[in-house]
Amino acid sequence: MRRLAFSSSALVLALIAGCAVIVVPEDGNAQIKSAFSSNAVQGNGQVATEQRAVSASVDGIDINGSMLVTVRVGQAPSLTVEGDSNLLPLLRTDASGGTLRVWTEGGVRTSNPLRVTLTVPQLRQAEANGSGRLQVTGLNGGDFDLRLNGSREVEIAGRVGRFDVRLNGSGSMNATALDSASTDATLNGSGRLQLGRLQGQSLGLELRGSGRATASGSVERLRVRLSGSGNADLAGLSSRDADISTNGSGSVTAKASGALVAGSNGSGSITVYGNPAQRSVSGKRVTVVQ
């Protein structure tokens, strides 16, 4: 009876947690396997390295899963993967179509992170889903598109003409070592964008949620749209003309010297430095500092 009571309690807990499968062997000892039971392959602790083929035509990367990825731009193409020797066959790579796809086949468990190192002459785009880290160095003047979904940490360095970044989730991007002439950035969620040094045309920034964004440098045009409780600290970015609006409790700090259009709806605030020559301001919480 005592064993039956325990099994019943476990069954209730499993059903509360989610779908449960009841397995009753011949000895009568019920086993409960929930939908969250892991079938992941355990790493054997024996770290190995593999060289894999990649062509010079690859100029993009698509990452799915938890791994540490490094992309180096500007040298002869190469691809190296590292991890527990029994997990490397599950770390899949496909370089067809000009984009390197990286993913794990099924679940894995290991104390040694899976590592991928890619070297390519050019990198035009990167997409990453899930957790882990992505580091890109040596960007060399072309346009670059970045798409992030999840909690991944990303570092970007080099020089680009146009930078287009979209972040969904709680991840973070540090581009303080990146120089760009024009940037378009969108953040949905609680993540963080450090947009680096802009020098030239424009910054377009959209924040939805509780995320944060920063930028430095100098641009001709600044456009900011903020919805929610987020924060855009752009006081380190000089702009000639600025168009800023907030909806919610978030805040924007910016700098403009030419024409300013600013509107605040809700409890959020806008603070603009630089004494802009032309001003069109609406909302009680818009402040222009001389």
Q: Which ranges hold each PLM region?
A:
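Intrinsically disordered, low-complexity terminal regions
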Residues: M1-Q290
